[in-house]
C-alpha cells in the first residue's frame, strides 16, 4: 500500500513537472508570436515578457486548469504583422480570437495541427489568398469566422468535410466567387452561415433546410439566383433570413413571416414578383421586414399590420397598389416606414401620428391625395419625412414644426399652397429641405437663415415673391434653388429687385399712402412715354444700320428670323475669348447647315464644329429635344448655372442661343474627339490603324480614367447643390491635344429624353449599356451612384477595348460587365485585356477592372462614391492598390 502511494506521488510530481515544462515552452511560443508583430499601437502585448506569468499576467491569454493555453483573445487591438506558424504548437488551445486587427498574409498551413480548436475568429483583418483547405481537417471546430478580409477563390468543397460539430460559419465581406458547396447540408449541427458581400453565383444548395437546427441564413449582396420560396419555407426554426441584393426570382418566401422565431426578413433588391399574399398570424418576434426593390404587385396585406413587434417596414420600389392600411397606426413599435415608388393611392392615415417611436416616414412618388395629417407632429422623434411626388394639397401645417428632431423634410412635387411658415426656422437640425414644385406663395421667411445644418435647399417652381433673404447660408444654394418663382428677386437670381415689381409683391413691404401711389403712377406714365420715344428712335436706327447694333444677346441665324427680318433669337456668351461681331457669327454659324461639320450625335442633339477667323473653334450642340424643359426661362436658368463651372477635366460651357425654333448650347471644342471614337472607330482619322487609335496606350487610358473620376467627384461634391450627369458614356468623354479627359454634357439631365413605359426612348438606346439598373427601372430617386455605375462601365471599356453591349452574332448579345465578371471569376482576367495594349502592368489592369465591377454593382449602396474612386485610382497608380 505504501508503494502504491509513493507511485501516485511520483506520477503527480512528473505531471506537474511536465505541465510546468510545457507552460514554459508555450511562453516561448507566445513570445515568438509577439516578435512577428510589426505594430502594436495600444501596447496590447506589453505584458508579454519573458519572466511574466503566462496564465495570470499575459494580456488576452486564458489557461485551462492544468496551466496550458486555452484561449487567445486579442480583439480590436490593431495589431499588425503576419500570423506566426509557431502557434500550431499550442496543444490544448480551444479559442483563437484575433478579430479587429491588421494581420496580413493567410492562415499558416501549420495550423492544421490545432486539432483542439473550437473557435477561429480572424474577422476584420487584411488576410488574403484562398480559403485554407486544412480547415476542413479541424474536426473539433464549432465556430469559424473569416469575414471582412480579402480572401479570394471558391469555397473549398472539402470545407464541410468534417463539420458534425460546426455551429456557425462566416465568410462574409470577401472576394469569394463560385457556388455554395452542396456539402454544407451535411453539417447537421449548423445553426447559421453568413456568406454575404461576395460574388457567389448559382443557387442555394438544394435541401439546405435538411439541416435540422438551421436558424440563420445570410447571403446578401451576391449573384445568386433561382426560385427559393419552397425550400426556404421548410426551415421552420429560422430567426434570420437575408437574401437581399441577389438575382432570386419567383415568389418571395413570405410564409417565413409566420414562423415563431423569425425576427429579421430581408428579400430586397431581387427579382421577386407576384403578390405578398395574406399573412396569417404574423410572428410576434418579427422586427425587420424589407422587400423593397422587387416586382411585387397587389395590395399591402392587412395581415402585415399584425406584426406587432415590427420596427422596420420597407416595401419601397415595387408595383404595389391600393391604399395604406389604416391599421398601420397600431404597429406601435415601428420606427421606419418606407413605401415610396409604388402605385399606392388614397390618403395618409392619420393614425400614423400615434407611432411615437417613428423615425422615418418615406412615402415619396405615390398617388396620395388629401393633406399631410397634422397628427404626424406627434411623432416627436421623427428624423425623415418624405412625401414628395404625390398629389397632396393644403397648407404646410404649423404643427409639423413640432418635429424638432427632423433632418430630412421633403415635400416637393405636390400641390401645397399658402405661405412658408416662418417657424420652419426653428427646425435647427434639418439638413435637407425641399419645398419645390408646389404652389406656395408669399415671401421666403428670413428665419430660414438660421438653419445652419442645411446641405440641400430648394424652393423653385412655386409662386413665391419678394426679396430672397440676404443670408449666405440660403443664397449659397445657387439660383436653381429659387428659379421659376415669377415675383422673387435678389441674389442669387439675376432678377434685380427693382424689376417686374418683385419687391413690391413682398408681404413685408410697408403699406403705401394714397398720395405716394399717385406720384408713382404719374412718374410711371412719364417714364413709359420716354421709353416709347426711345424705342421708336432705336428701331429707326436699327433699320438703317442693322449690323452695327448687334449685341451678344442677338444672332442672325436664318431659322430664327421672322418674316420682317427682325432677329428674334437670344445669344449669351460666357467667354470673352469668343467673337461678338455680327459678321463673325454669321460666318461661323453657317456650319449648322453643313452636315460635313457634324462631329457627333448624342441623346439630345447633334454637335457641330463652328470655326471663326483667327482659328477659334467651338462645339455647337443643336438640341433636338428639351426633355423636361418647358420654356425659355427654364432653359436659360439651367444653362446659366453651368456657365461658371471650372475644372481641368470639364469641357466648359461657352454660352447658349435660344429662339422659338432653335436652341443651341455652345461649349469648348476639344480636338482629339471622344473616347468612344478613339477606342472603337474602325478607321480612326490621322492613323493607319484599322481599329481605334493606337496612340491610346495604357498610361493615357489610366489618365483618362482618373481625369473623368475627378470631374465627376467635382460635380458631386464641390458643386452646391450637387450636379448629376446621368449620361456618362465614352462619347461624352472628350480628349484634348494631350489626351487628357474633358467630360461633356454634364448638368443636362433635364434635357434628356423622358423615359417611356418601356424604359427608354429609341434616341436614348445607345446609352443603355451605361444606365444603372435603378435608373432603367424608372426609379425617380436618381443619385450620384447612377453616375458611378456608368463610370464603372467606362472603366471596363478602357481595360477591354470593348463596347458596353456587343452582338458577336445575330442571336448573341454580350454585356461587357457580365463578360468581365465571368472571366475574372474563372481566373482568366488577362483574356479581357485589349490586345492592342502594350507595355502595361498586368496587376494594374486587374485592379482597375475590379474597380469597374465594384462601380457596376447592382445595389447602389455597394458602389463607392466618386471621391473614393479617385482615391483608389491614385493608390493603384502609386503601387498601393494590390
From Swiss-Prot:
The keyword Lipid biosynthesis does not apply. It catalyses: L-seryl-[protein] + ATP = O-phospho-L-seryl-[protein] + ADP + H(+); L-threonyl-[protein] + ATP = O-phospho-L-threonyl-[protein] + ADP + H(+). Glycans are attached at residues 76, 121, 261, 266, 321, 341, 402, 417, 426, 458, 463. InterPro entries: Kinase-like_dom_sf, Leu-rich_rpt, Leu-rich_rpt_typical-subtyp, LRR_dom_sf, LRR_N_plant-typ, Plant_LRR-RLKs, Prot_kinase_dom, Ser-Thr/Tyr_kinase_cat_dom. The chain crosses the membrane at residues 516-536. Its main location: membrane. Residues 537-882 are cytoplasmic. CDD domains: STKc_IRAK. Residues 22-515 are extracellular. One of its GO terms (molecular function) is ATP binding. The modification Phosphothreonine is found at residue 589. GO terms for cellular component: plasma membrane. The keyword Transmembrane helix applies. It is found in: Cell membrane. Its EC number is 2.7.11.1. Gene3D superfamilies: Phosphorylase Kinase, domain 1, Ribonuclease Inhibitor, Transferase(Phosphotransferase) domain 1. LRR repeats lie at residues 92-113, 116-138, 140-162, 165-187, 189-210, 213-235, 237-258, 261-283, 285-308, 309-331, 333-355, 357-379, 381-404, 405-427, 429-451, 453-475. ATP binds at residues 599-607, 621. Belongs to the protein kinase superfamily. Ser/Thr protein kinase family. This is Probable LRR receptor-like serine/threonine-protein kinase At1g12460. It comes from Arabidopsis thaliana.
Amino acid at each position: 500500500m505504501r508503494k502504491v502511494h509513493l507511485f501516485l506521488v511520483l506520477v503527480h510530481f512528473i505531471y506537474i513537472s511536465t505541465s510546468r515544462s510545457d507552460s514554459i515552452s508555450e511562453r516561448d511560443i507566445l513570445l515568438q508570436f509577439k516578435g512577428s508583430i510589426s505594430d502594436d499601437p495600444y501596447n496590447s502585448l506589453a505584458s508579454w515578457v519573458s519572466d511574466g506569468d503566462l496564465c495570470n499576467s499575459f494580456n488576452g491569454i486564458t489557461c485551462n486548469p492544468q496551466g496550458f493555453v486555452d484561449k487567445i483573445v486579442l480583439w480590436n487591438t490593431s495589431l499588425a504583422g503576419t500570423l506566426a506558424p509557431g502557434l500550431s504548437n499550442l496543444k490544448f488551445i480551444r479559442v483563437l480570437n484575433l478579430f479587429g486587427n491588421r494581420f496580413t498574409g493567410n492562415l499558416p498551413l501549420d495550423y492544421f495541427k490545432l486539432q483542439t480548436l473550437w473557435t477561429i475568429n480572424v474577422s476584420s483583418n487584411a488576410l488574403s489568398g484562398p480559403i485554407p483547405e486544412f480547415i476542413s481537417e479541424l474536426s473539433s471546430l464549432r465556430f469559424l469566422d473569416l469575414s471582412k478580409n480579402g480572401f479570394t477563390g471558391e469555397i473549398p468543397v472539402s470545407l464541410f468535410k468534417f463539420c458534425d460539430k460546426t455551429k456557425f460559419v462566416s465568410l462574409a465581406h470577401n472576394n469569394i466567387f463560385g457556388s455554395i458547396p452542396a456539402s454544407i447540408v451535411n453539417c447537421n449541427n449548423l445553426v447559421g452561415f453568413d456568406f454575404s458581400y461576395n460574388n457567389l453565383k448559382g443557387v442555394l444548395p438544394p435541401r439546405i433546410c435538411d439541416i435540422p437546427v438551421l436558424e440563420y441564413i445570410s447571403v446578401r449582396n451576391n449573384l445568386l439566383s433561382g426560385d427559393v420560396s419552397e425550400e426556404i419555407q421548410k426551415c421552420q426554426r429560422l430567426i434570420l433570413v437575408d437574401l437581399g441584393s441577389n438575382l432570386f426570382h419567383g415568389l418571395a418566401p413570405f410564409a417565413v413571416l409566420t414562423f415563431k422565431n423569425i425576427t429579421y426578413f430581408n428579400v430586397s433588391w431581387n427579382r421577386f414578383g407576384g403578390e405578398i399574399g395574406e399573412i396569417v398570424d404574423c410572428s410576434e418576434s418579427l422586427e425587420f421586414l424589407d422587400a423593397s426593390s422587387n416586382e411585387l404587385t397587389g395590395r399591402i396585406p392587412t395581415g402585415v399590420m399584425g406584426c406587432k413587434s415590427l420596427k422596420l417596414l420597407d416595401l419601397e420600389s415595387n408595383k404595389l397598389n391600393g391604399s395604406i392600411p389604416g391599421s398601420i397606426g397600431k404597429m406601435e413599435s415601428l420606427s421606419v416606414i418606407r413605401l415610396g415608388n409604388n402605385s399606392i393611392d388614397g390618403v395618409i392615415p392619420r393614425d400614423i401620428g400615434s407611432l411615437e417611436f417613428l423615425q422615418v416616414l418615406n412615402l415619396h412618388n405615390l398617388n396620395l391625395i388629401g393633406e399631410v395629417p397634422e397628427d404626424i407632429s406627434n411623432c416627436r422623434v421623427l428624423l425623415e419625412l418624405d412625401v414628395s411626388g404625390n398629389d397632396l394639397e393644403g397648407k404646410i401645417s404649423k404643427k409639423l414644426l413640432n418635429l424638432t428632431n427632423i433632418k430630412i423634410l421633403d415635400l416637393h412635387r405636390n400641390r401645397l399652397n399658402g405661405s412658408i411658415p416662418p417657424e420652419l426656422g426653428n427646425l435647427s437640425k434639418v439638413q435637407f429641405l425641399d419645398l419645390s414644385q408646389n404652389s406656395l406663395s408669399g415671401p421666403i421667411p428670413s428665419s430660414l437663415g438660421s438653419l445652419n445644418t442645411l446641405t440641400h435647399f430648394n424652393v423653385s417652381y412655386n409662386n413665391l415673391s419678394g426679396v430672397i433673404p440676404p443670408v449666405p447660408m440660403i443664397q449659397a444654394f445657387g439660383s436653381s434653388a429659387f428659379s421659376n418663382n415669377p415675383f422673387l428677386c435678389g441674389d442669387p437670381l439675376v432678377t434685380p429687385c427693382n424689376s417686374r415689381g418683385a419687391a413690391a409683391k413682398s408681404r413685408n413691404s410697408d403699406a403705401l399712402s394714397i398720395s405716394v401711389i399717385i406720384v408713382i403712377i404719374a412718374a410711371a406714365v412719364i417714364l413709359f412715354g420716354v421709353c416709347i420715344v426711345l424705342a421708336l428712335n432705336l428701331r429707326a436706327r436699327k433699320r438703317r444700320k442693322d449690323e452695327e447694333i448687334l449685341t451678344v444677346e442677338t444672332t442672325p441665324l436664318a431659322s430664327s428670323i421672322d418674316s420682317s427680318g427682325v432677329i428674334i433669337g437670344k445669344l449669351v456668351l460666357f467667354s470673352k475669348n469668343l467673337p461678338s461681331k455680327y459678321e463673325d457669327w454669321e460666318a461661323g454659324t453657317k456650319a449648322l447647315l453643313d452636315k460635313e461639320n457634324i462631329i457627333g450625335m448624342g441623346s439630345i442633339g447633334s454637335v457641330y464644329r463652328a470655326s471663326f477667323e483667327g482659328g477659334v473653334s467651338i462645339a455647337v450642340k443643336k438640341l433636338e429635344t428639351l426633355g423636361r424643359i418647358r420654356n425659355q426661362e427654364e432653359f436659360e436658368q439651367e444653362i446659366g448655372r453651368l456657365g461658371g463651372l471650372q475644372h481641368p477635366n470639364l469641357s466648359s460651357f461657352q454660352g447658349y442661343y435660344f429662339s422659338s425654333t432653335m436652341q443651341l448650347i455652345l461649349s469648348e471644342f476639344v480636338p482629339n474627339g471622344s473616347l468612344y471614337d478613339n477606342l472603337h472607330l474602325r478607321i480612326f482619322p490621322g492613323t493607319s490603324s484599322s481599329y481605334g487609335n493606337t496612340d491610346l496606350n495604357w498610361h493615357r487610358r489610366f489618365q483618362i480614367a482618373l481625369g473623368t473620376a475627378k470631374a465627376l467627384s467635382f460635380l458631386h461634391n464641390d458643386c452646391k447643390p450637387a450636379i448629376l450627369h446621368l449620361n456618362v458614356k465614352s462619347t461624352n468623354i472628350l480628349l484634348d491635344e494631350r489626351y487628357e479627359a474633358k467630360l461633356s454634357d454634364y448638368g443636362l439631365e433635364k434635357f434628356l429624353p423622358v423615359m417611356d413605359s418601356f424604359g427608354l426612348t429609341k434616341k436614348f438606346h445607345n446609352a443603355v449599356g451605361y444606365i444603372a439598373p435603378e435608373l432603367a427601372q424608372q426609379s425617380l430617386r436618381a443619385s450620384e451612384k447612377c453616375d458611378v455605375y456608368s463610370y464603372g462601365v467606362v472603366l471596363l471599356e478602357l481595360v477591354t477595348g470593348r463596347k458596353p453591349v456587343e452582338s458577336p452574332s445575330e442571336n448573341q448579345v454580350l454585356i461587357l460587365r457580365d463578360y468581365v465578371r465571368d472571366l475574372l471569376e474563372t481566373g482568366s482576367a488577362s483574356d479581357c485585356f485589349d490586345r492592342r495594349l502594350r507595355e502595361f502592368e498586368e496587376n494594374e489592369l486587374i485592379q482597375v477592372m475590379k474597380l469597374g465591377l465594384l462601380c457596376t454593382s447592382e445595389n447602389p449602396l455597394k458602389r463607392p462614391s466618386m471621391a473614393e474612386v479617385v482615391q483608389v485610382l491614385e493608390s493603384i497608380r502609386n503601387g498601393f492598390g494590390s
